[in-house]
From Swiss-Prot:
Record organism: Schizosaccharomyces pombe (strain 972 / ATCC 24843)
Name recorded for this polypeptide: Sexual differentiation process protein isp4
Membrane spanning residue stretches: 94-114, 121-141, 167-187, 196-216, 264-284, 339-359, 413-433, 461-481, 490-510, 512-532, 537-557, 572-592, 611-631, 642-662, 683-703, 732-752
GO CC annotation: endoplasmic reticulum membrane; Golgi apparatus; plasma membrane
Record-linked PANTHER family: ISP4 LIKE PROTEIN
One GO MF term: oligopeptide transmembrane transporter activity
Region (Disordered): 1-28
Stated family: Belongs to the oligopeptide OPT transporter family.
Keywords: Endoplasmic reticulum, Membrane, Peptide transport, Protein transport, Transmembrane, Transmembrane helix, Transport
Record field: compositional bias (Basic and acidic residues): 10-26
Main location: endoplasmic reticulum
Coiled coil: none
GO biological process terms held by the UniProt record: protein transport; tetrapeptide import across plasma membrane
Amino acid sequence: MIGSINESPIEEHMNDSPSTKEKADSVDISDYIVSHSDDSLSKDIKKDTKSFLDVEHGEISTVDEFEEDSPYPEVRAAVPPTDDPSMPCNTIRMWTIGLIYSTVGAAVNMFFSLRNPTVTLSVLISELLAYPALQIWDLIFPDREFRIGRLKFNFKPGPFNVKEHALIVVMSSVSFGNAYSTDIILAQRVHYKQRFGFGYEICLTLATQLIGYGLAGLSRRLLVRPASMLWPVNLVQCTLIKTLHRKDLRNAVANGWRISPFRFFLYVFIASFIWNWFPSYIFQALSLFAWVTWIRPNSPTVNQIFGESTGISILPMTFDWNQISAYILSPLMAPADALMNILLGVILFFWIVTPALNFTNTWYGDYLPISSSGIIDHFGNSYNVTRILTKDATFDLDAYQNYSPIFMSTTYALAFGLSFASITSVIFHVILYHGKEIYDRLRDPPAPDIHEKLMKAYDEVPFYWYLSVFLAFFGMMMGTIYGWKTETPWWVIIVGVIFSAVWFIPIGIVQAITNIQLGLNVFTEFIVGYMYPGRPLAMMIFKTVGYITMTQGLAFAADLKFGHYMKLPPRIMFYTQMIATIWSCFVQIGVLDWALGNIDNVCQADQPDNYTCPNATVFFNSSVIWGVIGPKRMFSGKNTYTGLQYFWLAGVLGTILFWALWKKWPQKWWGQLNGPLIFGGTGYIPPATPVNYLAWSGIGLFFNYYLKKIFADWWQKYNFTLSAALDTGTQLSVIILFFCLQLPMVNFPDWWGNDGAFNTLDATGAAVRKLVNESAGEFFGPAEW
């Protein structure tokens, strides 16, 4: 599978099914706490990392001669308990390379997001390529101070260092992701024929991207500083920087393995780069190895049960790291209890509940695929949204009643229910499991860990800086909706921001511990559909403010934790995040406007170069369904999916039950059940299928439970290095394949592994047990709607 996932590809037609994820357990889980006294490799690593941050500068600031370290083995494996406050990082070198990378990444990702299939430059690729860029800079520029009047500067204030490298990673992180507002702009300009101009586009983008930054800064006491807020995604980035910069660390033997982390990274990187050519290009059947469907390719039941494209993946197999890590990142980053809870959720809801519903014809499952993210009419065809719109793109009730209600596959409908359950579950989970901890931390912060102690060497960003950012861009958002004819009242923005703020801490805690984020996308669409129906633009704006404010804010919080681990001065972090984000907004809007003005038939289904704007099309369809048709016609009264409303209550009751089991039997496996993860951890199904989650959780449990328990030294030395190597090798291979072969339409010679293996009902999306004869006037579903 060439390409990568931007937001949640789950936004297929009806847009997102629950883009969820999360977890949480008591922060004091014994699985995370490891005694220092018997951790020999940990001691070796402490000795080795003693010089990690002083490559260029003498002594390192430490506490108690390195005897103090993080209580979490994950952090000890990736982050040295050291710092050198004198290390320069606010340098011309850092700003130049960082802004170049931000510009290229934002422009490339924006441009190719308009194409199907797409390709995405990831932050890990930026992190990897920044290393040789910094080396080349040092070869070109002298270490010499220049003066212009009273201004002094140096292009090379010593050899490049880890802090400069880390700040470039931060700038890439905030600029590489496509702004959600660009989908609003595309929907307006292409489908609704509204063009408000560059001023509107840039104000909308800046406001929606940066309101969340204020929330991130205001939540530092709860989401960034506590040692228990691990943010596992950062540990891989820290490990990669450490691996690249310190090839000479003392090479302690780990369970018989003597190879250095750098050489280990290099070998795995090369192997994954080469291997990806097979499932992505040479032998694509390796990606979704649905071998049972090859035996019975035309059996709807076999393809529904064993299929891996539109089935429920019984006997799952994949040999493609893209399939394993594309939706919820590398499994080597997730804690074992999070992996187990998500695995339980997949088995319960998609191996037991889904076939039980589908094969009893619940929600007319006989006539629908068992797993698909499309919306379907009562003839079994893709739902034709244009048939229910007037010429000015407003809802035509008569046309709707003369056409068809909306139907969904069983997994898609169930995913909405699970999204409802996860929204209520996360609130009750955080109150029950973490409420006292939050209260105590706000009232009397606990003693800092070693990393927080080391950060005291730097001036903190004042509270009012973040508050000012929040208020400034909130004001810009208000000015945007009234400065242009958006038909969006002020209270829609306020309610959207309140939604983000209320769920920011609960979802942030879960994400910081488990690396799984629960999304508010479905919830915001659902609420605005009831609250302000018939206003598609208002729906899109509310969703962006209510959902992206939280998502973007949590991404900023994750970067703040990365800076915390890498001992980056907080005020320099503030400047780099703000400047890179603002600059990337201008870059993305510039690229978008250029593409709309210079690519013929852009965003049209017949565009010859495949610049069909798939995300924007899905976003438009979503605005019609939620903003025009509205959830009332799907989830209320006697409509087909009304029963899904009970999942709100299921999320509450399930979480209370799991909490009671935890209080009674905290050491038993049933005491570790986690409501938000069980209900919401599978939020990318569909378009993901169970094979993505089963392979992900299986590999994750092998490394983060079995190897961590049996071969702890090996795990601590190599686990995150392995994750970084697999990700970067695969992603770089995907990029080269895309630009060198896929973009110029150079296909591998036809053979069964790229052709015949996909001639199944599962692969073609046609695994349906019953069909209707539309020409004879047959249809399924209710007689009236």
